[in-house]
Amino acid sequence: MLSQPNKKPLHIRIQPQDEKYDCQMKLGTMGMRIRQSVDQGYRLPSKFVQDNSSVTIPDYKRVPLPKNPPMLVNQRTVSSTSSIETWENDLDQRLTTIDDKTLTDKLGMKRNWDQVEF
């Protein structure tokens, strides 16, 4: 017959101790009580909740909007001479200038503050 091996405990069980202080047992469960309060959403008894219903403004009156809304664009905001083509040409010129400066400048794009042109 095979005998069963004895199992060894992995950890030594701590024996309960007598309370030295009145609140010692309460301190041991404080973490669980905090978790429970958070889970319940800090429900307070009704005597601690303030009722503001008598102070609030009863109703707001809506102001009707005009039938014809104001225009978003007028003659001052739109120019007939502006076009995407002129914007693209200006952009191409700026990009070409930047490319030329990076190729010809020995420092590349690195500069000191006293070398910056404003």
Swiss-Prot record:
Nucleus among keywords: yes
Keywords, in A-Z order: Cytoplasm, Nucleus
InterPro entries membership: RNR_inhibitor (IPR013900)
Keyword match Nucleus: yes
Location of the protein in the cell: Cytoplasm; Nucleus
One GO cellular component term: nucleus
Signal peptide: none
Role, per record: Mediates the nuclear localization of the ribonucleotide reductase.
Family to which the UniProt record says this protein belongs: Belongs to the DIF1/spd1 family.
UniProt-recorded name of the protein: Damage-regulated import facilitator 1
Organism the protein comes from: Zygosaccharomyces rouxii (strain ATCC 2623 / CBS 732 / NBRC 1130 / NCYC 568 / NRRL Y-229)
Lineage: Eukaryota, Fungi, Dikarya, Ascomycota, Saccharomycotina
